[in-house]
Amino acid sequence: MTNRWKTAVLAAALAVAFGAEATAPKTDLMGYTAGADVISVPVTDGRIDVVSGVVYRQIKSARRVDQLLMTVLQPRTNGLKPAIVYFPGGGFSSADHEKFIEMRMALAKAGFVVAAVQYRVVPTKFPALIEDAKGAVRYLKAHAAEYGIDPERIGVLGDSAGGYVAEMMAATNGEKGWDTGDWLNVSSDIAAAVSFYGISDLTTIGEGLNQDKVHSSPAVTEALLVNGAAFGNFAGAPITADRKKAMAASPLGHLDGTEPPVLLMHGSADTLVSPMQSKHFYDALKAKKTDVSYVLVEGAHHGDDPWFQKPVIDRVVTWFKAKLGGEKPVAGKTADKGANL
C-alpha cells in the first residue's frame, strides 16, 4: 500500500470516526464556483428579538412627564415563556438598564423573555424605585400576550442597588400599598428572585469593612434615598437617624415567610457592599422557611470580572430554569421566522 493510499484510508477513517462524510463538495448547489467552501450549518440556537425604548411607566410632575424605559430580549418562539426583569446597579444614583448583556443574553438564549428596566434614583426618595419595579412587573403581565410571557412565571434579577431592588421585590411579595400608576388590575407579585451583592439592611452596608464610617454621613446615597437631601431647615440625616424608617426601606424589615424562592450571590472580597448583607438575609430567610440558596464567590469583589464568567451565569440560568420552568407550547400558534430580519 502506497503512502498516498494509506493517507487517504486514514483520512476516511477519521472522517467516519468523527461523524463526518468523506464526500466531495456539492458542486451542483446554486451559487457554487470552483474554490468555494461548502459548509452545512446545524441550527442549534434560536433567534432573539430586541425591543428597545419600551415606555413602561410615566411619572407626571407639574412641568414634565418622565418616561421610564425597558429593553426586552424576546426569544423568537411560539410558546409561553417565563420572564426575568433585570434591575441594574448604580449605587442608587444611576440605573443604566443596558448593562449586563452577558447575563441577559444567556437567559434569553435559555428561553426566557428578559426585560431590563430603568428606575428612579436619588434625589428621588424611597419608595419610588420599588414602585417603579412593581410597575415594570405589572406592565409585563398586562402585555404578556404581546411578548409571549406566562404572567405567573416572572422572576427578578439585580446587582448591587439592583440586587436591593430584587430583594425588596421578594420581601414585599403580596404586601399592599406599593402599587401605583397603571395596570393596577394585575398583581406585581413575582415567582423568584436573584440578587448579586445586594443590600438587605440599609443601616449596615459597610459592616466589617474599613469604609464603614462613610455610611454615617447624611450625604451617602442610602441616606439620601431614605431621608432626602439637605434643604431649607432640614440639614440632612444619616441612615441610622431613624432606624424604624430605615428598616421599613430594607428587605430585612419585611420578611414574613411568604417570599418566593431566592438566590443570593456575593463576593467574599467585596469592599463596597459587605458580604454580611447576603449572609444576614440568607439566615433570616432560612429562619422563615423560605426556599433560599446562597453562593459566596471566593475572592470576588463588587461587580468585577468573576461575575461575568460562565460558571456564574450558568448557575443563575440553571436556578431560574429550576424555579420557573421552561417554555410551554401554545396550540395552533407558530412563530414568524422571517419577521424582523
What are these regions (language model features)?
Residues 26-78:
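N-terminal cap/lid segment of alpha/beta-hydrolase-fold proteins
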Residues 43-46, 208-254, 287:
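Mobile cap/lid helix-loop segments that gate and shape the active-site cleft of serine hydrolases
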Residues 80-90:
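Short beta-strand element of the alpha/beta-hydrolase
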Residues 95-103, 115-151, 306-312:
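Catalytic nucleophile-loop/oxyanion-hole region of alpha/beta-hydrolase
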Residues 121, 297-304:
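Histidine-bearing beta->alpha loop at or near hydrolase active sites
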Residues 135-211:
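Primarily recognizes the serine-hydrolase "nucleophile elbow" in alpha/beta-hydrolase
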Residues 258, 264-266, 270:
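Short beta-strand/loop motif that positions the catalytic acidic residue
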Residues 271-277:
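Conserved alpha/beta-hydrolase "acid-adjacent" motif
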